[in-house]
């Protein structure tokens, strides 16, 4: 099979993996090397400086000895199979980089022969990119559950980010749908990655404080950091009966115990006939979107999972976003005065984000804020007005300050909106990398 045919097959197979995220690292270009990851983001995501960059998102192989019920590449499926050679994929990545099609690589894989054999091939590909071709662009590599600790350590020195898929929210569901994987085979590499990142960070901090090191820092800078962009993971939702309550509590635990940079949620998409899987073709994109919103609140707005959801109501509302839902269920905390409220309270107001709250705190030092000033600061005033006062005057006039009335004002169903579509799910939307190649 030629390289073009391999790429068409393996890029299409990679579209089911959604764990792409911005890197947050600042490795820049260097004389004699190619690419850079300065404030880098990745495919369909935004970097710290607002840029949207793309990755070559591909599987190393779709040959797999595992038989996960929901996976298109499972060993029991009769589908075309192929694999890249390490240098072949490295050359392909460089060709697309030189054509300015991509700025990095997102590499996942089926399990070819064994986890260790697969990881050895991936490491060789990344070694060629980094050491022979001097590629300094962003690389996100998926670690295969069951990979030995030595190989995982080597992978972490070549990739910017490593991720191990959690796959499913419970051990019971994992045993049912992924008979070749165990919770320990997934959690153990996560733990090793966490410890490797911490050890690398501590070692570099000690080296920076050492006078002898500082005197010789130029050659020492060539030492690669271990997974400098951290680790992430992904869970499939809707394939098994776990509730949003269970999923968000697991997500919260992963952030706290494994120091995850990101937990991704992927709405179950039916690609196989299997009695263990849900019947029908419904894709729960609305549920996925609400989980992402709740996850965002936990990461950046200092919400705890227990504040957003509980066992009494174990699923997030789909007709209203989690922040607005929390606010209308805690009306005793509102309205707040924007000119005096602490930053932490401003963050809890629907329509006021992190940047908006910081802008309010800064601007009110110079002048008292009203509607016009809030709009200029980027606040979503149409939503925020129900929960604030400006100079002592309530801004939500004309609407009763009760749960039912505010719910009617803030309800925002998403099934028919832009959040109800995603190229990787509803459309086979990964862009063609062949246009214009003669």
Predicted regions and their residues:
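Flexible, acidic/Gly-rich N-terminal and inter-domain linker regions that tether
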Residues: 1-63, 380, 388-389, 396-438
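Conserved, mostly hydrophobic/aromatic
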Residues: 55, 68, 107, 164, ...
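Local cysteine-cluster metal-coordination motifs and their immediate loop/turn environment
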Residues: 62-74
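Core AdoMet radical
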Residues: 74-89, 96-122, 128-149, 156-216, ...
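Flexible glycine/acidic-rich beta-alpha junction loops that bind and position SAM and/or redox cofactors
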Residues: 116, 169-178, 203-242, 261-285, ...
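Catalytic cores of alpha/beta
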Residues: 147-158, 240-256
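Long, highly charged, low-complexity intrinsically disordered interaction regions
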Residues: 273-347, 381-420, 424-438
